[in-house]
């Protein structure tokens, strides 16, 4: 009888629904707290509602899944026939999601390997896809974890935000950095480094910042085979145009995904976000 390894991630991977269905990946939702309402990302709050709330400066916070939600997910997957589970999550530097999964894994009916990928958005999504493809090929839990970790090591993520205010409010970047990024109309470029959102460059205007984001992503891709994801929040035209330019500039491009981030990431970046994830194959 063949073994079956199941892949779990969380809602901040922002994987296309068709990819999750095709590979049998389960995503556990994080929570967005809007005023006095706790809403599950992906099902109970739209990015449009989030953007409107942020623009009106309504209080918006986020929280990790309850460990019991992970426990229920692991039980359900085990009952469906899985012999082992690989649970891949956004950076533990940014969220307590990984810790909640670890708590639940201790009582799971099958072995669960919980992995802090150090990633976020499709940087996490590409790790989940790599693990799922390995599992589908008959790989063990350890082999699926290795595939995800290898993918993470070859993945970079870069972001443009209109302002650092939202990251500062959420504690994802230092107050001094946020103050500097807001001064003199500076437009910040950020990167995912060591599992944290760190400053990369400061550019004077939005158009120059987006052009520089494109240049950085194209240089990172080089000529080797890569997958790319372009993310945005309330900026679909900018994202589509950036994706088109990257198609022309990246000779080794395999797959390119364009998607709007969900409410959890959006709550910390604000409207106008553009992000590019470059992942080596």
From Swiss-Prot:
PROSITE patterns: DEGV. The keyword Thylakoid does not apply. InterPro entries: DegV, DegV_C, DegV_domain_contain. The lineage of its organism: Bacteria, Bacillati, Actinomycetota, Actinomycetes, Kitasatosporales. GO terms for molecular function: lipid binding. Keywords: Lipid-binding. Hexadecanoate binds at residues 62, 95. May bind long-chain fatty acids, such as palmitate, and may play a role in lipid transport or fatty acid metabolism. Disulfide bonds: none annotated. Residues 5-280 form the DegV domain. PANTHER family: DEGV DOMAIN-CONTAINING PROTEIN DR_1986-RELATED, FATTY ACID-BINDING PROTEIN TM_1468. It comes from Streptomyces coelicolor (strain ATCC BAA-471 / A3(2) / M145). The keyword RNA-binding does not apply. It holds the Pfam family DegV. This is DegV domain-containing protein SCO2569.
